[in-house]
Regions:
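A metal-dependent hydrolase metal-coordination microenvironment
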Residues: 46-103
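Generic structural signal for well-ordered alpha-helices
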Residues: 51-55, 78-85, 104-105, 133, ...
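Catalytic pocket-lining loop regions of alpha/beta-barrel enzymes
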Residues: 121-232, 274, 279-292
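Substrate-binding cleft of extracellular glycoside hydrolase catalytic domains
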Residues: 93-109, 116-124
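Hydrophobic faces of well-ordered beta-strands that scaffold small-molecule active sites
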Residues: 3-7, 66-69, 92-96, 112-116, ...
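Active-site beta-loop-alpha junctions enriched in small/polar residues
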Residues: 8, 71, 97-101, 117-119, ...
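Mid-to-C-terminal alpha-helical segments outside catalytic/metal-binding sites
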Residues: 1-5, 12-60, 65, 220-221, ...
Length: 292
């Protein structure tokens, strides 16, 4: 069973970057704060990034479950994600978006976790946001956080982990693996309830491109730091699909000889099943494609 620990959905996209709006266009493009960007594959024509499209990709790639995280650049997708979870209650785990203001207990309780965009916070001191960490711990929710580059926030995170030992934390973007100091983010997973997910790793190594040998070496380094049991695969769908297919975002792991079969099973699904509390999910059938 494979689980994608880092994917995005939006309907519609209505975020901001550097104080400027992000506006969906046609052909998978967006006005990204005044710059034209290919936000997702061009066949996603109408600017919507829907759960039906994601599930079709997951089925073809034989991915059983997914975790939907959020980003300021997409705008809050809380309401849409609740709709998605109603359609796919077993296959999805969803987060509400922390926007540096209080979240009502009743609202957070409707989600599986809360997303904190650590590197995009107006106040970058994580200790100033302790209330949301404490709230998630109290309500039994996980925190998904993409931290600022390198070790800029690791000391504060260590402090928060110590204060809230029962809080489950998933650190995203594989610790911003191509930035000096990334190993300190990985080392946070030495704590019992802290895990690392690799959403965006193909973006971070995009200049090298498939089959991403440096990404595989980074996974091996992370195993040496915190152990394979704390690492989870994530695709960062759909933005990474502007360069590769959804299946390619994981099959470089499946095909490498640098990881054992047991390490692959844990990284691609078993660890996420445990961390996010997924039930035993069916594995989508293999579909023969037109070039096989």
């Amino acid at each position: 069973m494979i689980i994608d620990a880092h994917a995005h959905l939006w309907n519609p996209q209505a975020g901001r970057v550097n104080g400027k709006p992000v506006i969906p266009l046609t052909g998978g493009r967006s006005d990204f704060g005044g710059e034209l960007r290919q936000m997702m594959p061009p066949y996603m024509l109408d600017g919507r990034n829907t759960v039906e499209m994601l599930m079709a990709n997951m089925d073809y790639a034989r991915v059983s479950g997914c975790v939907i995280t959020q980003e300021y650049i997409d705008g809050s997708q809380d309401s849409y994600l609740l709709e998605c979870k109603e359609k796919y209650p077993d296959r999805m785990r969803i987060t509400c978006l922390y926007e540096e203001k209080p979240i009502a207990d009743e609202w957070m309780s409707r989600f599986d976790g809360v997303k904190i965009c650590g590197g995009r916070l107006e106040n970058q001191d994580l200790l100033a946001h302790e209330e949301v960490f404490a709230q998630a711990e109290r309500l039994g929710k996980f925190v998904a956080i993409d931290m600022a580059d390198g070790d800029l926030q690791t000391d504060a995170m260590e402090e928060l982990i110590g204060r809230h030992p029962d809080l489950r934390i998933a650190v995203g973007h594989f610790g911003m693996v191509t930035v000096d100091g990334w190993e300190k983010q990985i080392a946070l997973a030495k704590h019992k309830n802290v895990y690392i997910e690799s959403g965006g790793i193909t973006w971070l190594f995009h200049r090298e491109f498939y089959p991403y040998p440096s990404a595989v070496r980074a996974i091996r380094t992370a195993i040496d730091i915190c152990g394979i049991d704390k690492l989870m695969w994530g695709s960062d769908y759909p933005r990474t699909m502007t360069a590769i297919t959804y299946d390619m975002s994981k099959d470089f792991v499946e095909k490498t000889t640098e990881l054992s079969d047991e390490e692959k099973r844990k990284f691609l699904g078993e660890n996420a099943e445990k961390f996010y509390g997924f039930p035993k999910l069916a594995v989508p059938d293999k579909m023969i494609n037109m070039v096989e």
